[in-house]
């Protein structure tokens, strides 16, 4: 099956004279319906990479294909219609005076007929559980609610791919959980491809696969289990340890023998219960 996204030897410089490219020889592919997290410290190139995928930035070298189309000036608008982006600060994304007006904005720009527009706005708000807030002013919403409305605005456009560019980084834990649960629900319903750009290791744990960026290069990729088993190597890259790994470190310091393989939070709970019952 042909990947929905293919990058081959991508290079990008913000200035031609830059000695160190923002992206250097980056290659990977993503399948339809996959959730891929791209992690790395600040300045690693992960957000630059996201902007090349939907054509906000054009690479200096290499090729990008989205939905089988090569990214170039002739195809860039077709590709942008396939890729929706949710950015870091929800307040910077609102243009409508009410929630429903804001969700309708992108549809108006595409010239969608009014009857279809009303239907799409209703459907999108229902899917992110914000239909009861349709007449509300965006400024009166919580951070998590604002991001759910931003997601609804993207969902209404019916893209094949959603990119979350640090979309949960300004939210409290409750808001972050709201957004992740919303994305999981929509992904399962529509077989959407999700790319999350994040430095939040716990958010990345929701992905099928993780790509690790460092100094503009792709340095590692694999399942969350594979990546998180690196342990202290993540800390050396400027990243945090996921909660289960932190718990394992704390238990080891107290003389408890813990599994060497990576465990999810659910797996850690199961292991703890089994350990207690076997004593």
From Swiss-Prot:
<keyword id="KW-1003">Cell membrane</keyword>
<comment type="similarity">
    <text>Belongs to the ABC transporter superfamily. Energy-coupling factor EcfA family.</text>
</comment>
<keyword id="KW-0547">Nucleotide-binding</keyword>
<dbReference type="GO" id="GO:0005524">
    <property type="term" value="F:ATP binding"/>
</dbReference>
<keyword id="KW-0067">ATP-binding</keyword>
<keyword id="KW-1278">Translocase</keyword>
<feature type="binding site">
    <location>
        <begin position="40"/>
        <end position="47"/>
    </location>
    <ligand>
        <name>ATP</name>
    </ligand>
</feature>
<dbReference type="InterPro" id="IPR030947">
    <property type="entry name" value="EcfA_1"/>
</dbReference>
<keyword id="KW-0472">Membrane</keyword>
<feature type="domain" description="ABC transporter">
    <location>
        <begin position="5"/>
        <end position="240"/>
    </location>
</feature>
<dbReference type="GO" id="GO:0043190">
    <property type="term" value="C:ATP-binding cassette (ABC) transporter complex"/>
</dbReference>
<dbReference type="InterPro" id="IPR017871">
    <property type="entry name" value="ABC_transporter-like_CS"/>
</dbReference>
<keyword id="KW-0813">Transport</keyword>
<dbReference type="InterPro" id="IPR003593">
    <property type="entry name" value="AAA+_ATPase"/>
</dbReference>
<comment type="function">
    <text>ATP-binding (A) component of a common energy-coupling factor (ECF) ABC-transporter complex. Unlike classic ABC transporters this ECF transporter provides the energy necessary to transport a number of different substrates.</text>
</comment>
<comment type="subunit">
    <text>Forms a stable energy-coupling factor (ECF) transporter complex composed of 2 membrane-embedded substrate-binding proteins (S component), 2 ATP-binding proteins (A component) and 2 transmembrane proteins (T component).</text>
</comment>
<dbReference type="GO" id="GO:0042626">
    <property type="term" value="F:ATPase-coupled transmembrane transporter activity"/>
</dbReference>
<dbReference type="GO" id="GO:0016887">
    <property type="term" value="F:ATP hydrolysis activity"/>
</dbReference>
<dbReference type="InterPro" id="IPR027417">
    <property type="entry name" value="P-loop_NTPase"/>
</dbReference>
<dbReference type="InterPro" id="IPR003439">
    <property type="entry name" value="ABC_transporter-like_ATP-bd"/>
</dbReference>
<dbReference type="InterPro" id="IPR015856">
    <property type="entry name" value="ABC_transpr_CbiO/EcfA_su"/>
</dbReference>
<dbReference type="InterPro" id="IPR050095">
    <property type="entry name" value="ECF_ABC_transporter_ATP-bd"/>
</dbReference>
<dbReference type="Pfam" id="PF00005">
    <property type="entry name" value="ABC_tran"/>
</dbReference>
<protein>
    <recommendedName>
        <fullName>Energy-coupling factor transporter ATP-binding protein EcfA1</fullName>
        <ecNumber>7.-.-.-</ecNumber>
    </recommendedName>
</protein>
């Amino acid at each position: 099956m042909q990947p929905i996204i293919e990058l081959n030897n991508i290079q990008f410089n913000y200035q031609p004279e830059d000695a160190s490219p923002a992206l250097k020889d980056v290659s990977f592919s993503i399948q339809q319906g996959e959730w891929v997290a791209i992690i790395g410290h600040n300045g690693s190139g992960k957000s630059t990479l996201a902007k090349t995928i939907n054509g906000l930035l054009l690479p200096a070298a290499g090729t990008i294909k989205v939905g089988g189309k090569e990214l170039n000036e002739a195809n860039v608008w077709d590709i942008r219609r396939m890729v929706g982006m949710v950015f870091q600060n929800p307040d910077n994304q609102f243009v409508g005076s009410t929630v429903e007006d804001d969700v309708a904005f992108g549809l108006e720009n595409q010239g969608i007929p009014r009857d279809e527009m009303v239907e799409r706005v209703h459907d999108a708000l229902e899917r992110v559980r914000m239909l009861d807030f349709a007449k509300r002013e965006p400024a009166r919403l919580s951070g998590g609610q604002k991001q759910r409305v931003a997601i609804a605005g993207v969902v209404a456009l019916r893209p094949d791919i959603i990119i979350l560019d640090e979309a949960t980084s300004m939210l409290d834990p409750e808001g972050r959980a709201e957004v992740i649960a919303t994305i999981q629900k929509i992904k399962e319903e529509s077989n959407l491809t999700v790319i999350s750009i994040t430095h939040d290791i716990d958010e990345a744990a929701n992905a099928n696969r993780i790509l690790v960026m460092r100094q503009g290069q792709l340095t590692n990729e694999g399942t969350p289990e594979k990546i998180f088993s690196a342990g202290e190597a993540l800390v050396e890259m400027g990243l945090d340890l996921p909660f289960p790994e932190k718990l394992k470190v704390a238990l080891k310091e107290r003389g408890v023998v813990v599994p060497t393989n990576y465990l999810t939070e659910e797996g850690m709970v199961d292991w703890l219960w089994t350990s207690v019952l076997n004593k």
